[in-house]
């Protein structure tokens, strides 16, 4: 945009002065001689002196006042646009900061979820260890009972002694009262019988004891095998769940790494694109600068040629004026005073003309500088607009990615909730089965001590069940807390 008009009031004033000088010029040689002497003798005043002496016309003042008002209005518009761009950039930075905080919170929640899974696996391992310890203690109890029975069979009980044994759950009472009475009754008869018959009975009893011992050993081994198989099944299930959880965590980590890599690639592409754009702008600006410099050099050359041409014309006119002075100096001495006043007037007009030229050059330089500043501001505005569009597109893509990740987390949470519900149902079913078994066992037993023992065991099992239910409630509350946190995110 060029603010310099094609024909300003300065140009009209200069042309008017030149016409006036041309109309009153060539008729008087003395005037031209004094003009040349004044041009050689008069020094060029400073800018402050010229501005102090300058009396611009009303048209010139109105013209430049209008130009300055237009420049100020354009400057205000540009400042408003820059303020809008600044607000948009601040809002974008705020959104980016909030997005980064949400990503950090999601990462922390994922870490907490993985920690909770690890704790759950540890609790399950602890429960399995307790189950295995319980089985081991039961097997050991059976072994101890068998040893006690063997010792009682070898030693023999007293006359009125009755021993009760619990074989395996459900607790069944084994009453050995008849065998003991038979053994007591056989003692006097054995003393009266023959020694051969007693030896046969001893051998038969030994064989029966050995067969019973083998049967007990086989039952104990079968119980151990069943307990080990159950432990192995639980361990395999737990290890499978651990492997699945680790694979799921690995998949999530791989997806996060891929998303981060894609973001880095997009950022690199944007930076390279902006670099190429700035390089192109730099190339264009340097090219324009060199072109303007070359044009200015050509203009300076033309101005120098015009100056030389004008100086040659001035020397010619001086020579002609001297010749005419020599010819006409003797003819018109009366007009010397009028020529002197005219020369002074011409000198003042020339000074004004020079001052106006300097002032016009100064205004032209100011207009050129303002045009350059306006072009620079427009270029910066275009660049910022492109950057804003790119950033808005990136924010839209990031929002889509975050919504997808949130949907995946919601799906995963729903699956985990279903898994917890199924676990709770299975544990409740096991608890009901255990209560039924205990009820049946209590209904089958008739002895008072056995009922008391069964009631104690029922109470212990109820305590354990309440403890497991409390742990399940805590886990459920943690899951609901994580769900609420994810919804808030």
UniProtKB/Swiss-Prot annotation:
Membrane-spanning ranges: none
UniProt keyword annotations, A-Z: Coiled coil, Phosphoprotein
Signal peptide range: none
Any one Gene Ontology cellular component term annotated for this protein: centrosome
Disulfide bond annotation, renumbered to this chain: none
Any coiled-coil regions, as ranges: 57-120, 212-487
Modified residues (Phosphoserine): 38
InterPro entries xrefs: CCDC77
UniProt-recorded name of the protein: Coiled-coil domain-containing protein 77
């Amino acid at each position: 945009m060029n603010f310099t008009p094609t024909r300003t009031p300065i140009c009209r004033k200069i042309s008017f002065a030149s016409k006036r000088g041309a109309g009153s010029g060539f008729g008087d040689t003395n005037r031209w001689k004094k003009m040349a002497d004044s041009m050689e003798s008069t020094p060029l005043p400073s800018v402050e002196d010229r501005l102090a002496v300058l009396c611009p016309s009303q048209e010139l003042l109105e013209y430049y006042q209008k130009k300055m008002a237009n420049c100020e209005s354009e400057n205000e518009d540009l400042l408003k646009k820059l303020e809008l761009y600044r607000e948009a950039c601040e809002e974008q930075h705020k959104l980016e900061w909030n997005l980064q905080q949400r990503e950090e919170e999601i990462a922390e929640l994922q870490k907490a979820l993985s920690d909770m899974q690890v704790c759950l696996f540890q609790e399950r391992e602890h429960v399995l260890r307790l189950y295995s310890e319980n089985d081991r203690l039961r097997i050991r109890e059976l072994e101890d009972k068998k040893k006690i029975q063997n010792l009682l069979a070898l030693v023999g009980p007293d006359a009125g002694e009755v021993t009760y044994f619990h074989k395996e759950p459900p607790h069944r009472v084994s009453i050995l009262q008849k065998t003991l009475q038979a053994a007591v009754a056989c003692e006097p008869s054995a003393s009266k019988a023959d020694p051969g018959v007693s030896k046969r009975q001893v051998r038969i009893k030994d064989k029966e004891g050995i067969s019973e011992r083998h049967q007990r050993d086989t039952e104990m081994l079968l119980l151990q095998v069943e307990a080990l198989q159950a432990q192995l099944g639980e361990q395999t299930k737990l290890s499978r769940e651990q492997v699945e959880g680790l694979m799921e965590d690995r998949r999530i980590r791989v997806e996060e790494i891929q998303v981060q890599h894609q973001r880095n690639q997009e950022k690199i592409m944007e930076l390279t694109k902006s670099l190429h754009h700035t390089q192109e702008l730099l190339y264009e600006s340097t090219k324009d600068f060199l072109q303007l410099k070359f044009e200015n050099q050509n203009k300076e050359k033309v101005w120098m040629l015009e100056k030389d041409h004008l100086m040659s014309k001035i020397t010619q006119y001086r020579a002609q004026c001297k010749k005419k002075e020599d010819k006409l100096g003797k003819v018109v001495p009366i007009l010397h005073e009028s020529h002197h006043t005219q020369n002074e007037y011409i000198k003042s007009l020339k000074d004004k003309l020079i001052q106006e030229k300097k002032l016009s050059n100064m205004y032209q330089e100011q207009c050129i500088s303002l045009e350059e500043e306006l072009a620079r501001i427009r270029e910066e505005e275009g660049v910022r607009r492109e950057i804003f569009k790119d950033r808005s597109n990136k924010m839209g893509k990031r929002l889509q990615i975050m919504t997808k990740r949130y949907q995946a987390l919601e799906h995963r949470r729903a699956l985990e909730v279903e898994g917890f519900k199924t676990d709770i149902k299975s544990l409740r079913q096991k608890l009901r089965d255990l209560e039924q078994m205990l009820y049946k066992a209590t209904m089958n037993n008739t002895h008072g001590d056995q009922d008391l023992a069964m009631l104690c065991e029922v109470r212990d099992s109820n305590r354990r069940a309440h403890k497991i239910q409390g742990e399940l409630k805590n886990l459920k509350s943690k899951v609901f807390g994580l769900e609420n946190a994810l919804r808030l995110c």
